[in-house]
Amino acid sequence: MPQSTKYILPVYGILALYSLGYFSYRNGYVNIVLEERQAWLDMPPGDPTKVAQPTGIASLDETLAAMFVFYWPVLDGSFPGLSLMFCNYLGALPLCLVLMTLESLRKGNRSSFSFFYSPTFWGMIAVMMTLAVSIPWYLTIHLLISTTASHPTIENMSIPLAELKALIVNIVVGLVLPSLLVALPETITQTLFTRQTAITLWQLWPFWSTAVHFIARKFISATERGADSRAQWTRVRSAFRSVYGLTFAAAAIAHIATWSISLTAAYALPDAMSAETVSSLHPQTVFVNTWPWLPVTTDSVGEGTLWLLQWDKFVGVGAIYWWSLDLYRAAHTAQRKKINWYYFALKTVAFCLVSGFTGATIELLWEREEMIMEAGRAKEKTK
């Protein structure tokens, strides 16, 4: 494990606790959420779109009420900048979980520690504690115990074709589709479900994602029987490219769309909107983090949630980029190849411009995959 990661990833973990935990408490956000949660639980019946205690189980209803308070301003459009940041967030951190799932499926990670790589396990931790709090520690331990991280080879990095094809289905049906449904305006979805129902179901996305993957894998395994084994390498490479390509496309679309809306509102068409909306959608409001050590306070759930999402994304994406860089370097070391750091820096900047740090991370791991597969292919031909 490279020395840089030994220190950098734990620093990200500590930064997550400070910027998401301590900062949220100090700026008054936690107290506001608790007050709003109690107001939700005490809400009188009558509104069919808001049920105060949907399950009747006190502890569960309290947890759900906190989630409703958190997500309501994200989805109802009352804070345009927050809604835009959430769309940008969906095109970043959840896609990082796809990369983590990919690592969990590799042959070298199927051991007595396989439970550690479970995307369902880490997904539920992320739901309860935010992604940025959990991801740095997962990545640190992964680099310490995973053979695919320290000694990447075609053998230990291999993934069955059915698993790869199931992951493609999972990305579309288990991740992208639920995210789109929860982000749609209630005027569109109200005939199917209320916003409260959508939030509740979306919180269980790690289970839906796992179920989709399991069903798709079983179906695909049955259809793959009797397939021509001579074309196996080509089909596996094609499946890998589909996984990385879909993930990169989702990251790029979210990044370009959200930045385009923000820049258009701030500089191209500011007169077409109210001054309040223009200010809310300004890049400095949406994408520039509020430093957690400044003596600032918030008086609304929307503003506090925006600050939390900004730091959740910053820490989570930053940590996974360092992780991907170490995997990228390990692959080059294993193949005795040198990295042209000048070209690498230019390439990273270019990918960040069109797809953010998530897109740059995907590109690094994609290049690593291609390198190991080509080396393994060449080795097979010499036998």
From Swiss-Prot:
Superkingdom in the source lineage: Eukaryota
Pathway as given in its UniProt record: Polyketide biosynthesis
Topology relative to the membrane: Multi-pass membrane protein
Glycosylation sites: N109, N156
Broad class of enzyme this protein falls into: isomerase
Intracellular or extracellular location(s): Membrane
Cellular component per GO, a single term: membrane
One GO molecular-function entry: isomerase activity
Transmembrane regions listed in the UniProt entry: 5-25, 79-99, 121-141, 164-184, 243-263, 342-362
UniProt keyword terms in alphabetical order: Glycoprotein, Isomerase, Membrane, Transmembrane, Transmembrane helix
Enzyme Commission code: 5.4.99.-
Major localization class: membrane
Role this protein plays: Epoxide hydrolase; part of the gene cluster that mediates the biosynthesis of aurovertins, fungal polyketides that exhibit potent inhibition of adenosine triphosphate synthase.
Family: Belongs to the membrane-bound ascI terpene cyclase family.
Name of the protein this chain belongs to: Terpene cyclase aurD
Chain's gene name: aurD
